Swiss-Prot record:
<dbReference type="GO" id="GO:0047388">
    <property type="term" value="F:[glutamine synthetase]-adenylyl-L-tyrosine phosphorylase activity"/>
</dbReference>
<dbReference type="InterPro" id="IPR005190">
    <property type="entry name" value="GlnE_rpt_dom"/>
</dbReference>
<keyword id="KW-0511">Multifunctional enzyme</keyword>
<keyword id="KW-0067">ATP-binding</keyword>
<protein>
    <recommendedName>
        <fullName>Bifunctional glutamine synthetase adenylyltransferase/adenylyl-removing enzyme</fullName>
        <ecNumber>2.7.7.89</ecNumber>
        <ecNumber>2.7.7.42</ecNumber>
    </recommendedName>
</protein>
<dbReference type="GO" id="GO:0005829">
    <property type="term" value="C:cytosol"/>
</dbReference>
<dbReference type="GO" id="GO:0008882">
    <property type="term" value="F:[glutamate-ammonia-ligase] adenylyltransferase activity"/>
</dbReference>
<dbReference type="GO" id="GO:0005524">
    <property type="term" value="F:ATP binding"/>
</dbReference>
<comment type="function">
    <text>Involved in the regulation of glutamine synthetase GlnA, a key enzyme in the process to assimilate ammonia. When cellular nitrogen levels are high, the C-terminal adenylyl transferase (AT) inactivates GlnA by covalent transfer of an adenylyl group from ATP to specific tyrosine residue of GlnA, thus reducing its activity. Conversely, when nitrogen levels are low, the N-terminal adenylyl removase (AR) activates GlnA by removing the adenylyl group by phosphorolysis, increasing its activity.</text>
</comment>
<dbReference type="Pfam" id="PF03710">
    <property type="entry name" value="GlnE"/>
</dbReference>
<feature type="region of interest" description="Adenylyl removase">
    <location>
        <begin position="1"/>
        <end position="475"/>
    </location>
</feature>
<dbReference type="InterPro" id="IPR023057">
    <property type="entry name" value="GlnE"/>
</dbReference>
<keyword id="KW-0808">Transferase</keyword>
<dbReference type="GO" id="GO:0000287">
    <property type="term" value="F:magnesium ion binding"/>
</dbReference>
<dbReference type="InterPro" id="IPR013546">
    <property type="entry name" value="PII_UdlTrfase/GS_AdlTrfase"/>
</dbReference>
<dbReference type="InterPro" id="IPR043519">
    <property type="entry name" value="NT_sf"/>
</dbReference>
<feature type="region of interest" description="Adenylyl transferase">
    <location>
        <begin position="481"/>
        <end position="986"/>
    </location>
</feature>
Length: 986
């Protein structure tokens, strides 16, 4: 319907005449005369009154019911500055109140009078859209707190004053929820409140004490009546208490402790959304209980971790609202309809709930204050922010004009011509704040109802575009197969139907029994576990996606129990189920990794926090550069309390597990060759060793101080890595072969601690502490198994030796096998000068003259001893590590070459890893380049196979038919070295 603006003015003039006819006669004549003469937009006092009367029946009725207010307006029309300092103006009125009947009257008349002023300012565009809803909120807060304080004094006189254990008087705290909490109250809105008090106890000062709970419940009931009860003067605010814990079935007022327990254990999604805007009304910053209550509620709303339930819960709420809109026929509802106010609120709440725990700028209730913060974080574009802001203000302007007409809570567009005309006039031109909080006038091409609808629909379309992009459309209908799996979880299909599904997935019939048994066990487990509604919804969403992917995989018999075990472990940790629902690529990634690695499946099941690592495929396939492990680890530990040893120890384990997953994923998916895998695993271990030593040093020095002979900043301590750590060849399950050395000073004592001990005892305590940190079995598992048997004198030797004692032992007492071990050693931790000293000792020992025949005899004897001890009896299989032609033979060959040729060429002692040992041997013409290349290739191939067997959780054993060529070549080289002593040239 269209109508010209001249017709609108005529209609409103006629309406004004009808409404003014009820005014006292002395006002009627002057207004009628003004209507007859003033044809332009009203500018005079009477003209403004006439216009405001025409725009709002409520304004006219308030003038009629309160003649003294009409007289005030006649003398001077309301201004925006008259709509302030509500508490200061209400307090003297309440001071004169003697009973509850008078209280009801004063509150209602004050509320209507002040609302009428705001209606006037809104109609005449004397304040911005924000000015109006902020003042509406301030008015409500002042009235609520004024009523509470008056009733509190009466209640204390009657029932005594509630106090805590220290005898301090307690007050009733009121949480304003929804738009009241966000200073965004509608013109005619319900107010959502929650009542709480600091602690239990009893009242004092009355003839008969009652407990605090009863006192505050009665006070709350009286306050609700004072606000909500309808009298001849109307009501103050429709009061809704259903947002309190347990809703209508819960206590009207709860203590802080009871409220905290509820939100920790039973708080639901919609309560988190509601609590975003929760604000303590009348809060006094000097009141310690105010801060306590705020701190109590914040963790419930703003989680420290990213909560992926938010998106799905918002979708569910959206669909629920859409069903309500359809059911109630609310097609033209500017709040609940598509692109309406609620969708803008949802958009902002999504980011508050997902990011608010980490971004404090998002932890505020006012939507228009949060919106630019979201844009500043680049979560939405500047254009999207502006679209949402403009739409919100237009919709809120429309909503408040609608509600001010009859003081009715409505968001439904009017069907009658009169109210449509009012909206047209009110939305053509109005003021609002810009992004710099400065007043701006906005003008829309609105001249009739049709053009109003066009503008409205454009705003709604802008909102819906952002909303759909963020929240996402409703998921597509499940396929028939997915529906069947969904029904299986709900116990709605029989075993025969499961068999039919397996046939459709091309599963071998011989596997049916095993698969169905595992599925039934899983379903029975789900049935008896208390996973809650949210968890059950997430499970029914993830399983129909998970199971078809498992059965599409060739390794489904191995994969099914691994994946079911992971799901079983996260059944009661709904956030992780929802992570897999919201991130299908993460689920697919997990399936692929678990298919190829039992180790990963077990780790993820034991530590579900690792699922977070699957979210970023890019990061997953790109482990940090070698030199970044140390900085990444330190950055990771910064979020922990440095003095909390237990927390730091767990943090080290969690970092290792997460990083190990990234390395394994890159390995499985082909992003890392075997040599790089070992490099990454080794540098990861080194970074952890550095932090462990620092942590142990901190603990030991706190108690004993530091050795007096050390210069400032020195530790005088070396960690030597042997074996695979020393050779930069760590595998996924490798332990750490370590030797600890220290800078000696026989007479030195520690100083600066609680107790002084000898320096050698200090380093022994340090070594023990390091081993303890590595080996202690926490919930997060063991950090690394540590093997100290390669220290001087082995298990009978000191746990930590001085550098000088180590040198003497290696030069004069070490066995040949210990010198072999020294080949694969290198300094991992310690001051540069000490590492240089160790390198010199190592080079001196390895290049010392030795009898070649004795060396050959010792090496062969040690290898024979290992064969006998680690013999693999199964002739049908090959142990890659210990059998002839395997890894151990290659390692012995490398060690022998160094010990045999370093006396003539000390440069051959430079490297500790087998690959570079072979390379330097070829460069020095000890072996040919061809043999070097073949040895390296054999070694890499064998290690690669071991890596992948480790990932599968299997032993390093393969069928006898594998690696026959490699084994034959290695045995040939062994034979030439130790039985013919040739020049090893081809």
């Amino acid at each position: 319907m269209s109508f010209p603006l001249a017709h609108v003015d005529a209609t409103l003039n006629q309406l004004a005449k009808q409404l003014i006819a009820h005014f006292p006669e002395q006002y009627q004549d002057q207004i009628f005369q003004h209507i007859a003469t003033d044809k332009e937009k009203p500018t005079s006092n009477i003209g403004q009154l006439r216009y405001a009367i025409a725009m709002s029946d409520f304004f006219a009725e308030t003038l009629q019911k309160q003649p003294h207010f009409l007289h005030q307006c006649w003398q001077q029309c309301p201004r925006l500055q008259d709509c302030e300092q509500y508490a200061e103006r209400l307090t003297p009125l309440l001071a004169q109140v003697e009973n509850e009947e008078q209280l009801y009257k004063v509150l209602r008349q004050f509320r209507h009078r002040e609302m009428a002023k705001l209606s006037f300012c809104q109609s005449l565009n004397l304040g911005s859209v924000e000015d109006i809803f902020i003042r509406l909120s301030q008015l409500a807060e002042s009235v609520i707190i004024g009523a509470r304080d008056w009733l509190y004094q009466r209640a204390c006189a009657e029932m005594g004053t509630p106090v805590d254990e220290q005898g301090t008087p307690l007050q009733l705290y009121i949480l304003g929820m929804g738009k009241l909490g966000g200073f965004e109250l509608n013109f005619s809105s319900d107010i959502d409140l929650i009542f709480t008090y600091a602690s239990n106890g009893e009242t004092v000062g009355a003839r008969r004490s009652i407990d605090n709970a009863k006192f505050f419940t009665r006070l709350g009931q009286r306050l609700i009546n004072a606000l909500d009860q309808y009298t001849c003067d109307g009501f103050v605010y429709r009061t809704d208490m259903r947002l309190r814990p347990f809703g209508e079935n819960g206590a009207l007022a709860l203590s802080f402790a009871a409220m905290e327990l509820y939100y920790q254990e039973q708080g639901r999604d919609w309560e988190r959304y509601a609590m975003i805007k929760g604000r303590i009304l009348g809060a006094n910053a000097q009141d310690p209980h105010v801060n306590t209550l705020q701190q109590l509620l914040r963790p419930f709303v703003y989680r420290r971790y990213i909560d992926f339930s938010v998106l799905q819960a918002l979708r569910d709420m959206k669909h629920k609202i859409e069903r309500e809109v359809r059911r109630r026929g609310l097609v033209d509802n500017i709040k609940l309809g598509a692109g309406g106010i609620r969708e803008i609120e949802f958009i902002v709440q999504v980011f508050q709930l997902i990011r608010g725990g980490r971004e404090s700028a998002l932890q505020q209730p006012a939507l228009l204050k949060v919106l630019p913060e979201i844009s500043a974080l680049e979560l939405i574009s500047a254009q999207q922010q502006e679209d949402l802001r403009q739409a919100y203000l237009f919709l809120r302007r429309t909503e408040n004009i609608l509600q001010a007409i009859h003081d009715q809570q409505t968001q439904q567009l009017p069907e009658n011509t009169l109210d449509q005309q009012r909206l047209v006039l009110a939305t053509q031109r109005f003021t609002q704040w810009d992004t710099q909080n400065k007043l701006e006038t906005v003008t829309y091409p609105i001249h009739d109802w049709a053009s109003f609808c066009e503008v409205l629909q454009q705003h709604q379309q802008n909102v819906r575009t952002v909303f759909d992009h963020l929240i996402g459309e409703e998921k597509e209908e499940l396929s028939e197969t997915e529906t069947l799996w969904h029904d299986f979880l709900e116990n709605e299909i029989e075993e025969s139907e499961i068999e039919q599904m397996l046939i459709e997935h091309h599963i071998e019939e011989r596997d049916f029994h095993e698969i169905i048994e595992k599925l039934m066990q899983f379903r029975n487990e789900v049935t008896r576990r208390p996973i809650g509604t949210r968890g059950r919804i997430a499970l029914t969403q993830v399983m129909p996606t998970l199971l078809p992917q498992i059965f599409a995989h060739t390794a489904y018999l191995h994969l099914l129990p691994r994946m079911l075990n992971i799901v079983d472990k996260i059944l009661t940790r709904t956030t992780y189920l929802e992570l897999l629902v919201e991130n299908p690529q993460a689920l697919t990634q997990l399936i692929e990794l678990c298919a190829q690695s039992r180790m990963i499946a077990e780790q993820v099941a034991r530590h579900p926090i690792l699922l977070d690592e699957l979210l970023d495929r890019n990061a997953l396939l790109n482990p940090p550069p070698y030199d970044h492990y140390a900085s990444e680890l330190r950055q990771y530990l910064l979020r922990l309390t440095p003095d909390d040893e237990e927390q730091m120890i767990d943090g080290l384990r969690q970092f290792k597990q997460a990083t190990l997953l990234r390395i394994a994923a890159a390995d499985i998916l082909g992003a890392l060759p075997v040599m790089k895998v070992s490099d990454h695993l080794t540098f990861l271990a080194e970074a952890i060793i550095h932090v462990v030593v620092e942590l142990a040093w901190q603990q030991v020095t706190t108690r004993f101080g530091t050795p007096a002979h050390l210069a400032e900043g020195e530790k005088g301590f070396l960690v030597i890595g042997y074996g695979k750590l020393g050779g930069i060849e760590l595998g996924y399950k490798s332990d750490l072969d370590l030797v600890f050395l220290y800078q000696s000073d026989e007479q030195s004592q520690t100083c600066g601690g609680k107790r002084s001990i000898e320096s050698n005892q200090f380093y022994l305590r340090l070594a023990q502490k390091i081993i303890s940190i590595f080996s202690i079995n926490t919930f997060a598992g063991v950090l690394y198994e540590v093997d100290m048997r390669l220290r001087p004198s082995g298990e009978s030797g000191l746990l930590c030796s001085s550098i000088s004692a180590f040198k003497a032992y290696q030069l004069h007492d070490a066995w040949t096998w210990e010198k072999q071990a020294l080949v694969r050693s290198r300094a991992i931790y310690g001051e540069a000068r000490l590492q240089t000293e160790f390198n010199a000792i190592r080079a001196e020992v390895l290049s010392a003259p030795r009898d070649l025949a004795t060396l050959q005899q010792d090496v062969v004897a040690m290898r024979q001893k290992m064969y006998a001890h680690l013999a693999h009896p199964d002739s049908d299989t090959f142990n890659i590590k210990t059998d002839r032609g395997g890894i151990t033979d290659i390692e012995f060959i490398a060690q022998y070459l160094v010990l045999a040729h370093a006396p003539q060429n000390p440069a051959l002692t430079r490297w500790s890893d087998n690959v570079r040992i072979f390379e330097i041997m070829a460069e020095s013409a000890v072996i040919s380049q061809e043999i070097c290349d073949q040895l390296k290739q054999c070694y890499v191939d064998l290690r690669n196979r071991i890596h992948h067997l480790n990932l599968l959780g299997e032993l390093s054993i393969v069928p006898q038919t594998e690696f026959q060529t490699e084994r034959q070549f290695i045995q040939t080289i062994w034979h030439r070295l130790f039985e013919h002593n040739d020049k090893y040239e081809e």
